[in-house]
Amino acid sequence: MRYRFDNSPSLRVLPYAHEKMIPHKNSIRPAVRTASIALLTLFLFATAARAQEPPNPKAPPSERHEFVISNFKTESGVTLPQAKIVYGTYGHLNAAKDNVILMPSHYMADYHGYEWLIGEKLALDPSKLFLVTTEMFGSGHSSSPSNTPEPFHGPRFPVTTIRDNVEAVHHLLVDELKVTHLRAVIGFSMGAEQAFQWSVSYPTFTDRIVATAGTAKCYPQGFIRLESQINAIALDPVFNNGDYTKQPTKGVEAFALIWTAWLYSQEWWRDELWREGAKPGTTFESTLNEYKTNFIPGGDANDIILQMRTWERHDVGTTPGFDGDLKRALHSIKVPVLYMPSETDLYFPVGDARYESGFIPNVTLKPIPSLWGHTAGAAPNPADAKFLNDAISQFLRENAN
């Protein structure tokens, strides 16, 4: 079976792949948003959309930065004159520059998405470590279809890969921060995809990686799910193949419903765990409507699609030198790996993690015993937060150089 990739170097949607592109005359810029795990459990915790600010009021202070790469060539062959990476930092870089941990963002997230790990009594103590949290292309803050001028605005923005994101952050670390080695790369979901890619593309750049609720490849079932979500947006007449003059709200809401169906486990819905932390009087219908209408507050449709295209193309086996051989790429990983799938994840099934673990030389497979599906990998409740922090703390201690 052949995947139906649109191999155009620009952002396209399959149902419209042969239609003539129309110049985009009106810029639709997304409202600035906080896309953290508080977003993933948006209704449960009644988290409102805010400008980029910490979802955790007890989170340590962070600093926001921007790094611009001139003439950044993507894997598609398209060169962006200026590629911007937005990132946050916690703590201070020591003189030896050897206290750095990288945490790349998950889907449509900003740089605050790992604050469940950051704190004096948590796995990552910013008084001792320098933590760098980056935002992927398409976040709406880093270079994205919504914020890039013509000729790369909207659907003309190039499709970017996980490797493109890794390469951009490698430039950031080496050229901007003068950091040539990391203590760890820690990632959730698409952040886990980036962590695996780091360990294959730059096998000695980091001492170890941690991957929660994410795999080294997007498998066929995941590809089909992503295509269904992309098509849900594209079938909104307002979308106009990405050249819209207002957001395709109906399409984005249809996308959000599909996404929500896969976000948690069947048991989570059956046991009505959505009631935990919910306001009095909350119903299933109101919960579902909240996800439908407010899943990615202010999100731009082209940005949403771009990151799904990035996700679809993820495969460490296609890294140059491995000729599409996933097993050989995984076997090349030289550093210890803490692999933490959620036992009930429908996005990244635990079976895929078990399969991949069989080819990684030094792996600790530690599934998260949770009913919270995919979100379990980002600490959506106290039990999962404790399990993750304890496991990651132990792994970092045991594998310290």
Regions found by a protein language model. Give the residues of each.
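Catalytic-loop region of hydrolases
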Residues: 52-103, 111
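N-terminal cap/lid subdomain of alpha/beta-hydrolase-fold enzymes
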Residues: 88-151
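Conserved acidic catalytic loop of the alpha/beta-hydrolase fold
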Residues: 163-183
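Conserved hydrolase catalytic core segment
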Residues: 181-220
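Alpha/beta-hydrolase-fold enzymes
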Residues: 205-206, 211-294
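Short beta-strand/loop motif that positions the catalytic acidic residue
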Residues: 333, 339-341
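Conserved alpha/beta-hydrolase "acid-adjacent" motif
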Residues: 346-352
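Catalytic active-site module of serine/aspartate enzymes centered on a nucleophile-bearing elbow/loop
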Residues: 363-401
